[in-house]
Amino acid sequence: MSQFWGEFPEKVIQTFQHLQVALIGDIKKCALSSPLFPELSKLDAHSQHHLLASFELPRFGGVTPGVMEQLRDAESELAEAKQRLLRERLHAVANRQNIPYLGDCMYYDAPGISQEELLQAAFLEAPTPAWEHERIRPLWPKDEWFRDARQGPYLEDYGNIPLGDLDTLCLAFDALVEEHWMPIYLLISTFSMFQQYGTQPLLLECAQSAGSLIPACMMTDHHLEPTGDRQADKEARQDYADSQDSIQSMGDFWKEFYTKDSGKKIPDSHKSRLANDPNKVGFTKSALFHKQPLSHSLAQTWANFRGTQDKADLVKVTMDMNIEKYTVRLPDAVRTTAGPLYIEWINLPRMSENSARKLAEVGWNNADICGVDLAVKSHIAVGTPVRVIISLVDGACSDMPTATMCAFEVNLASQNNRSLNLPLLSLPFSRLLADLHDFQNRVKIACQFRDPEGFNVGTPMLSFSSLEFSELKQTAFERNSLLRDSWSEIEKRACHGGGRCVASQGIVQTWEKEVNPPLKEYAPLVLPPVPQPKRNFIDQQTGEVVQSFMQKSRSMRFKSPSDLWSRPSVDGGSTSTQPPSKGSLRCENVPGCAYEVDPLHLLYYESVDVPKDTLAGTLLARIDVRAKAAIFDSAVWRQWVRDGCLKPKIKMRITAATSCFSGIVLGACFDAYRRIPAATKTGITASLVTGLPNTVWATRDTSEVEWDIDLAAVCGHTFFALEDTFGYMDFLIYVLRGNEITAVADWSIYVSFHVDWTQESMLATLIPTFVWPPKPTDISLLKEVWGPYRFTLDGTEAKESFAIMPGTAILHGQQIVRTFPRVVAAHFRSWTGKVRMSIQEVSSIFLTGTYMVGVSWNATADLADIVTRKHWIVKSNEIFEVDLYCPYGENPTFTGQANGKPFIIVHKLGGIVGPKDSVGTFGFMIHIHGLTGVYKNPTLHSGDRSVGSAWFRINNIADDNLVFNIPGRIEDIIAAAGKYDVTNYVNPTSLLFSVTGLHGGIIRLHITWCPNTTLGESKGTLKYMQYLYHTATENFFGDQATRGIIDQDGFTIDIACGDFFGATRVGLPGEVERLGIYSSNAKSIAEIRVSFEVLSMNFYGSTIKVT
């Protein structure tokens, strides 16, 4: 050993001795000297003797968590100090002080330099245990490469060593550590303890430098015996280290080191952290966080030993192996406008609930996610061009661009990839079940495949492991953090890169959320009124405040805590009309959970009677809210009269009673354009009202419904107080499913309408709900309610089949009903995607059963056919997506009778079970919540020519004097009895005008005709006149033309649809632009045909057409 190292320079040895004396003095000054190193008693005798002789430390036992923390952290201090300290800082100090030096990191014989630099020199010349008996020093390279170096001003100075020779010096230092790792580790650990008690801060970084060289030696020394050949031993150690999956942590090493004689292997010792190759990307605690001073942990331990409380420890750093291995398989494709999308969602798991509760119980209230280390392993062949975007997503936000915190795109052609992500998200951390659930499930990982290159669904594409670094804090007041001061500091220690998302080879690109985005511009702030303080009830006898009878110790575990505490009031907020799930806890089920209704928001109320033996299809009430509110004369009505137009958002509250035995299903709809005849009293079904804004509820589990209606969205306009202008405020309440068991007596429903007049008015009189032309994504607007359907108690009816043809009309008895979403869908020949749906059980709770949902290309599929294909087993009110079974790859929209059509089948599995005397059937409703993944749907018309639509035809003309008008709105033309017949044509474009409330725009008319006699005998003319404005006394004329009976071209003229306010509707009285057609020789005309072409058109409000 001495032959290799030579001797230390005299100045260096003296400096180290002075340092040793200074350290001993600092120890004696320390008030908490007794618990400084409780691990001492566990060391071997030689190490104890060395430390006691060198530092005069007392003997004592015990294990302090802070000391174990330091032992574990020493391993993580890898190449940081060796590269940054030995090259950068020491070299900079030498240049600044003009100190003669040997190489980049070795100083000696430098009189006049500061104590900090002396400490540097002393530590970097760290001696072995034999330093007292034999002077040794690093090998001074005196020959060959050093001969031409410039000589220093002192005799002992060997001059400057070129920067490239640092490796030779590091080899010498490595040799020292490899042979004497145990005493050097103990030495630097002891040095690190005294940072707070007088030792220079630079000394800690020197200690970390040596610590970076120790873990591999510790991992191998107790497994391999030295052979005497230094190079052979070093290669053996390296081979052993390379064969291990990961580097042991300090804690695992000590456990194994002291139990090596027992022959037991420490289980799961490799799970402490990922193996870290210094040449690749990787996180360590030291990269992200400052070290917690060991003295702080020792002081905390000593305070606990004395029974005192120390409130200074407000920050805790955790490092969790969130996912050791997760395999991502290619998911099903979702159809989008940009093509198929393959995306897999994975929750980033946290610690167990029990571990989280224990931390919460001791006071940790906030969890800051500071960094996530993701390692990706590809499972496809090298060179296959498949890419995947892996995103860290905030699951509380439904908007993907907003929710994405950072993301990176991986080229799976490279087998191993790694990315460091700094998401910056703080989560509440408490004993509340909601907070624990949010902490464990909020952060998600999304794997989005661009193009799977023909790989089958379900193929394992990649595996990934994740390592998360978090920081726990006790209060929001805590501003202290162990996180590095800036991103640049983190980047230096993490991977010498840049940005919040840093990646290794194989990463194509990365995305990062802006840390300080500009704030959006909002409307002027409207301050709400100050809430009135709540009064406590005082016991008249004792004078004490009466406590709530819901004790704090009561355990309340419920599915959705937000349902309990965020109960919406009439003043604002939006409540889903879907009934709550079985596991949820509604406000009315909690004692004392009352809410206040502001009477100043009440527009009108009415009590609706329900017969005790009510039947399905019965209309209970038709409420003209505008007319009834005028009679009721509420405060809101007076505001309405004063302002003229109603505010856009209204709330309809329906309060009934829960009846779990009756099986009644009630509904309400908003018929703004009176498409349901006023004489209708019975026969109201879901097929009739599903195209109107509506809500449905079953009395078995719902007693109150709050329905928020946005008039701007469903109508595109508001309503005038003193007259019906654009439409009508008609609300219908009806029965969709009658009694299974007759009620004891007639009962009633309380219906009220509320308007918050502090809300903003509509920005314009008319806001279009649909703009021509239709787009492929508009087919996803399909939202309907079907049913009720049933399974009989005797099992004779155990299956219900539903054809999914979104472009066809709905059958309603002997009538057909056309709705706005279905007419829009009819503009496309086919569609692709999935159906979002749910099933709502509505029968008496005495009847129970289970069912599955399957798909088929025909309605004859039985249970054996369903279970062999993809199918779903669902519960009531759960929303799920159905991927249809289609042999052609596309689903027909409005035809398919010859080649088949897709069906959704609901088949009974178990049940139906009920008491002996049960009556009725097991009933359910089907809710369609829209279509997803719709893309590239071919239209009915070719894209390279104008779109013309047939409107009507006039024939059988019996009078030579023909006069008829074409109005400036698309509607059915009525024949003139005894003069001519009219045929109105049906097509998706003309139907679009009939299923919307108002329309306004420009159309181009194409008018053609033909004679009914031979060409030589035909005579006469046909002419038109455009009336821009017309009254009995005044006319504004537009274009005009006269043509002969024999004419091949006909007329083409543009005409505006809309009254003076910019829109019109079918059958609306008033003056609109029109076109007059005249002929004095009309009997010579066989027929006149009129088609139209939409140039531009806005549609307002969706409704239905019943024929």
Swiss-Prot record:
This protein's record includes keyword Transport: yes
State whether keyword Transport applies.
Answer: yes
Supply the alphabetized keyword list: Capsid protein, Host cell junction, Host cytoplasm, Host nucleus, Transport, Viral movement protein, Virion
For this entry, list what GO says about its biological process: transport of virus in host, cell to cell
Cite the SUPFAM superfamilies for this sequence.
Positive stranded ssRNA viruses (SSF88633)
Subcellular location, in the record's words?
Answer: Host cell junction, Host plasmodesma
Show the Gene3D superfamilies listed in the entry: 2.60.120.20
Which parts of this chain are annotated as the region Disordered? 553-584
Annotated Polar residues bias: 572-581
GO molecular function ontology, one term from the record = structural molecule activity
Q: Which GO terms describe its cellular component?
A: host cell cytoplasm; host cell nucleus; host cell plasmodesma; viral capsid
Question: Which domain of life, per UniProt?
Answer: Viruses
PTM info: Specific enzymatic cleavages in vivo by the P1 encoded 3C-like protease yield mature proteins.
Q: Give the main localization category.
A: host cell
**Further remark:** Virions are comprised of 60 copies of the coat protein.
Task: Please report which protein family the annotation says this sequence is part of.
Answer: Belongs to the nepoviruses RNA2 polyprotein family.
Please report the name of this protein according to its UniProt entry: RNA2 polyprotein
| UniProt organism field | Raspberry ringspot virus (strain S) (RpRSV)
